[in-house]
A protein has these predicted regions:
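Loop/turn-rich, solvent-exposed surfaces of beta-rich toroidal or solenoidal domains
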Residues: 12-14, 44-147, 158
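Acidic, serine/threonine- and glycine-rich low-complexity intrinsically disordered segments
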Residues: 1-61
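Beta-propeller blade signature
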Residues: 1, 22-37, 80-104, 166-188
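Eukaryotic short linear interaction motifs
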Residues: 19-21, 75-77, 161-162
C-alpha cells in the first residue's frame, strides 16, 4: 500500500469474522510503520474474505487501487441494488477499492465478473515484466501499452453453489485447478 504521504504500509481489507457475529468486518484497517488505523468511516461491501488481489498506484491522480477477484462477500448487486446475504456467499464480483489523494476510500464494481464462483483463498502473482513500485504494487505511470498481461490468479476455492456452507453441502467446493491470466486493458476515452 502506498499512502497519500508517499509512505508505504499495508492495508487489511474488510474481512470475516466478527467476534460476536458470524459476519464480516466491513471496514479496512491501515497499517503504518508506527501505528494502525481502523477506518470505521468507510464500509467495504464487495469483498470480505481473502481473495486474489492486484494493487496499482496511479501517480497522475495520486490514487492507490486494489482490485479484488471474486471470493466471498456479504454484499452483492442484484438488479442494480446493493443486497445483503447474511450467509456470506461465494461471489463472482470483481471490485476495486481505491484510496484517493486526500486519503478517502471509494469502492466500485466492474461489469466483468469471474467466470465461476471462485477467487476465495486464491493468490494474484504479478508478472515479473510489469513495472512496479515494489511491494507488489503495479506502477500505472510506467504502462504505455493499450493492453498488458499483469499477472496470474492461482489456486483458491471453487464452488458450484453460492452458499454451500449454510446447508452443509461442502462437497460442491473444491480446489481451483485453473490458472487465470489477468490483463489490464486501457479504457477508451
Amino acid at each position: 500500500m502506498k499512502y497519500p504521504n508517499n509512505e508505504f504500509g499495508y492495508l487489511i481489507s474488510a474481512g470475516v469474522f466478527q467476534i460476536n457475529a458470524d459476519l464480516p468486518f466491513l471496514y479496512p484497517v491501515e497499517i503504518h510503520a508506527n501505528n494502525y488505523v481502523p477506518r470505521t468511516d468507510f464500509n467495504q461491501y464487495l469483498s470480505h474474505y481473502h481473495s486474489a488481489k492486484a494493487s496499482f498506484f496511479d501517480s497522475a491522480s495520486q490514487q492507490m487501487h486494489h482490485v479484488f477477484f471474486g471470493g466471498i462477500s456479504q454484499y452483492s448487486y442484484v438488479n442494480g441494488v446493493l443486497t445483503s446475504d447474511p450467509n456470506v456467499p461465494f461471489v463472482k464480483t470483481i471490485s476495486r477499492l481505491s484510496m484517493t489523494q486526500n486519503g478517502q476510500f471509494e469502492e466500485s464494481m466492474f461489469s466483468t465478473e469471474m467466470p465461476a464462483l471462485t477467487g476465495s483463498s486464491a493468490r494474484f502473482f504479478n508478472d515479473f515484466s510489469v513495472p512496479s513500485l515494489g511491494n507488489e504494487i503495479i506502477d500505472l505511470a510506467q504502462i504505455t501499452a493499450d493492453s498488458l498481461r499483469i499477472g496470474y490468479i492461482v489456486g483458491g476455492i471453487k464452488s458450484t453453489e453460492a452458499n454451500p456452507f449454510s446447508v452443509n453441502n461442502t462437497g460442491v467446493t473444491s480446489a481451483q485447478s485453473t490458472i487465470f491470466e489477468v490483463w489490464l486493458v486501457r479504457a477508451s476515452t
